[in-house]
């Protein structure tokens, strides 16, 4: 049966006990309102560790002033059942005082330069500082050997990898594949914000990503690929933050089309902001 912990000393005692037995420990950090994508990360982590801890903490420092912190969905009972079914061993439920003992205003910030400052970093200033700050604290609290993050948040994964490399965290970072609805929409806790009218339109993002891949692979200039993608999304009713092709490190590619690329989209449909990506 899954253990639920709200006390840091109890969490550390549990993890230290596992490690004394020679067991590898994985962490799957979440903000709750879990879905099949999150549970797939638990199952991925299980392949690389003997015990899996998942955390649920809606982190106030990664939400902007006009974002959805107050209304972010919280579904604790369903989360617990789903995590247990997925094979999670322990659920860590810190409160704000545990996570930020000096308060959020005095929290020591962590900034990952470069990769944090483009795309999502431009659209949501300070977002990745909040992500890095809370993830570093979770790493310190849980002391995992492995941690799993979803590739849907492609840039977040890149930011965390950079932070881990720079700060020498002895943690292996796993990237879990995007889990999609039947029509191709990437699973997200925010999908439930979509209206009944907008939900069928939302899968357009996946179709546009595939078009971007195919057009770019056929030799179409990058700027033309990006402009066409934005136009298609706008025609469908989206307000586009970005639709771009980048190198895997999120820098802008030159004129050559050789090598790995990733197409990334962020766009609003109604009141819902959706992000997705496609590696190719």
UniProtKB/Swiss-Prot annotation:
Superkingdom: Bacteria
CDD domains named in the record: PanC
Amino-acid positions noted as binding (R)-pantoate in the UniProt annotation, renumbered to this chain: 62, 156
Enzyme superclass (EC): ligase
GO cellular component: cytosol
GO annotation, biological process: pantothenate biosynthetic process
Gene3D superfamilies assigned to the protein according to its UniProt record, in alphabetical order: HUPs, Pantoate-beta-alanine ligase, C-terminal domain
Active site residues per record: 38 (proton donor)
Residues annotated as binding beta-alanine: 62
The EC number(s) this enzyme carries: 6.3.2.1
Function description: Catalyzes the condensation of pantoate with beta-alanine in an ATP-dependent reaction via a pantoyl-adenylate intermediate.
Stated family: Belongs to the pantothenate synthetase family.
NCBIfam families reported for this sequence: panC (TIGR00018)
Protein's name in the database: Pantothenate synthetase
Organism encoding this protein: Xanthomonas axonopodis pv. citri (strain 306)
Phylogenetic classification of the source organism: Bacteria, Pseudomonadati, Pseudomonadota, Gammaproteobacteria, Lysobacterales
